[in-house]
């Protein structure tokens, strides 16, 4: 609890004790009305002086119609009608509800504050003479050398100069997978250095670092309100004056016709207590705040409640392939040696033949067969569109596509697979084929199933060859695929899909944020995946996934849909209970105690329901 909340709790306890004592006193002792009034005013002012002050200031500033005004009029009116205990009790329960609401908001803010803990407090700046001084991260320039000790947060983005360590990225990604860094590796701010001492050369000032951008994004997320939040705010602006006029009419018109002024005034005051819109005005923003906070704990950064609401309406999810559904790293995934040839001989021959090439395919072959002596290869000849011809240990080795085998009159066995096939021959003899492909991410298939289970149609757009794209789409269970696309073609396809999408449904585009900025901004919801350290992704996207896990997309959608379910539950529940109690109040069936339940009770239940968004465990 905060200091202010503790002070309010003490006032509530003091007022509650005084109320109970006075109720017992007047049960056994008969005292004049003016003595009772003076005694009841003590607990009333202890618990309600701040509400009265706020109501007065609201009237003074021309903003009278709020919950403070409603409570002040209702309780002062009840005391004026001689219902001292009810007037004090209404104010007491209202303050209990306000304290509960304040505590719930504080709890939801703490989920954001936990993310705020990634902000580094200081940086160890190394001078030219080797001395180290502790400075504010804002004071560290680009190109400076900082020292990060074990257990400390990396304060600024940079490159490791010396040292080797393991970084904990859990605060940024929501996952506790460690990452090993060595000299030459890039590191980003907000990660925790687990073991070794690192010397880092800074590449950005603090204001432009990853951690500063993330904090700015989360802190400003509450400014972008969801349409339903804006509706509730506008609703309350007209609703409160309307119920005040209704209460005034209820207090004046019926007694002019039927008499019994005191009874109708009490009905009108109960009407005011019931009509307070606290349950909606507080619980709806709290639900969105809790949803954004809960998502941030899992490494899903949502830029505002409007994007969370839009995500819940997603009907079509469009994916880029490379780097989003696949790892974007070429790797030897399958080998088919010819009869009498070992896999080791096949890979070694191909790796040595490709030892002079910088092509990604060549690199993947060398990685599959590390530790080879490149001096064994010589006279490498690259044949455009075919492959390479290299002398290895004095023998001619060919490595390339089917056209190379045919042009060199090699009797080869054709192979099939989702990726690039490299055929290898030595001195005219076919050695076998090697399949090199972009490896699918382990959770990509699960992510597609999760989205389809939520009624979302999945589409993949890629620049890859149709055969490769079709195999990946079939393997992952994607509904629709369009291949061989240039970046401009992807934008055109998104435009087409936007025109085809069902009414009241949204289109989400998921990319790695590197070449996808135009499409991310054109889609209804742009989701950048693997944005850890990617400025372009954080800027262009509406929702940012800090790691490379496609399953987070399905998770984000579940969070958004749960958020909207809770919002609509609270709206229906609050309006239904209040409408019923308002009718009963106008008919004289309910009293002020019913009003307390319809206001404070409904608010507490709605806030409790809203705080369910903070429970991220059930999303796992």
Show where each model-derived region lies.
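Actuator/coupling domain of P-type ATPases
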Residues: 2, 23-27, 33, 39-126, ...
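Membrane-embedded transport module
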Residues: 501-504, 541, 546-620
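Conserved ATP-binding TGD loop and adjacent catalytic N/P-domain core of P-type ATPases
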Residues: 392-394, 420, 426-569
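P-type ATPase nucleotide-binding
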Residues: 149, 332-457, 466, 475-494
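Juxtamembrane helix-loop transition segments at the membrane interface in multi-pass membrane proteins
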Residues: 56-65, 100-113, 286-305, 611-620
């Amino acid at each position: 609890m905060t200091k202010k909340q503790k002070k309010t709790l003490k006032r509530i306890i003091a007022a509650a004790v005084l109320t109970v004592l006075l109720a017992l006193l007047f049960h056994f002792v008969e005292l004049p009305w003016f003595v009772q009034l003076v005694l009841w005013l003590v607990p009333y002012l202890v618990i309600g002086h701040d509400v009265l002050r706020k109501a007065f200031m609201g009237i003074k500033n021309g903003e009278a119609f709020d919950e403070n005004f409603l409570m002040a009029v209702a309780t002062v009116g009840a005391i004026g009608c001689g219902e001292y205990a009810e007037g004090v009790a209404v104010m007491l329960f209202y303050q209990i509800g306000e304290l509960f609401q304040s505590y719930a908001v504080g709890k939801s803010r703490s989920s954001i504050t936990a993310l705020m803990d990634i902000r580094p407090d200081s940086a160890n700046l190394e001078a030219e003479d080797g001395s180290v001084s502790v400075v504010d991260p804002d004071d560290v320039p680009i190109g400076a050398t900082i020292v990060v000790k074990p257990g400390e947060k990396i304060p600024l983005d940079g490159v490791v100069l010396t040292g080797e360590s393991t970084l904990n990225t859990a605060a940024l990604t929501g996952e506790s997978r460690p990452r090993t860094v060595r000299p030459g590796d890039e590191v980003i701010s907000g990660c925790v250095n687990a073991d070794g001492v690192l010397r880092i050369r800074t590449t950005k000032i603090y204001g432009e670092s990853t951690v500063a951008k993330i904090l700015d994004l989360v802190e400003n997320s509450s400014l972008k309100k969801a349409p339903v939040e804006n509706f509730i705010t506008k609703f309350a602006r007209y609703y409160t004056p309307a119920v005040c006029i209704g209460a005034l009419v209820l207090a004046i018109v019926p007694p002019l016709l039927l008499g019994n002024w005191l009874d109708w005034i009490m009905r009108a005051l109960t009407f005011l207590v019931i009509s307070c819109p606290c349950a909606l005005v507080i619980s709806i923003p709290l639900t969105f705040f809790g949803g954004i906070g809960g998502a941030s704990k899992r490494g899903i950064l949502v830029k505002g409640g409007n994007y969370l609401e839009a995500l819940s309406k997603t009907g079509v999810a469009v994916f880029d392939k490379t780097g989003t559904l696949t790892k974007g790293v070429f790797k030897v995934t399958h080998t088919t040696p010819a009869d009498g040839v070992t896999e080791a001989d096949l890979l070694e021959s191909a790796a040595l033949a490709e030892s002079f090439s910088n092509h990604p395919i060549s690199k993947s072959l060398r990685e599959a067969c590390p530790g080879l002596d490149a001096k064994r290869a010589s006279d490498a000849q690259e044949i455009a569109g075919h492959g390479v011809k290299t002398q290895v240990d004095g023998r001619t080795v060919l490595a390339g596509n089917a056209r190379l085998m045919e042009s060199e009159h090699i009797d080869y066995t054709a192979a099939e697979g989702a990726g690039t096939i490299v055929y290898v021959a030595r001195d005219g003899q076919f050695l076998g084929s090697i399949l090199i492909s972009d490896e699918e991410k382990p959770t990509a298939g699960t992510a597609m199933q999760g989205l389809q289970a939520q009624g979302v149609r999945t589409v993949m757009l890629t620049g890859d060859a149709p055969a490769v794209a079709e195999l990946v789409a079939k393997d992952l269970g994607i509904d629709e695929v369009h291949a061989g696309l240039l970046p401009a073609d992807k934008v055109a396809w998104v435009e087409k899909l936007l025109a085809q999408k069902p009414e009241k449904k949204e289109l989400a585009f998921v990319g790695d944020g590197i070449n996808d900025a135009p499409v991310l901004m054109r889609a209804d919801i742009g989701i950048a995946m693997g944005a850890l350290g990617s400025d372009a992704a954080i800027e262009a996207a509406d929702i940012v996934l800090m790691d490379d896990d496609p399953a987070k997309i399905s998770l984000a959608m579940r969070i958004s849909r749960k958020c909207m379910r809770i919002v609509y539950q609270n709206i229906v529940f609050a309006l239904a209970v209040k409408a019923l109690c308002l009718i009963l109040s106008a008919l004289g069936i309910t009293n002020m105690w019913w009003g307390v339940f319809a206001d404070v009770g409904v608010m507490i239940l709605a806030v409790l329901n809203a705080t369910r968004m903070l429970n991220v465990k059930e999303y796992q």
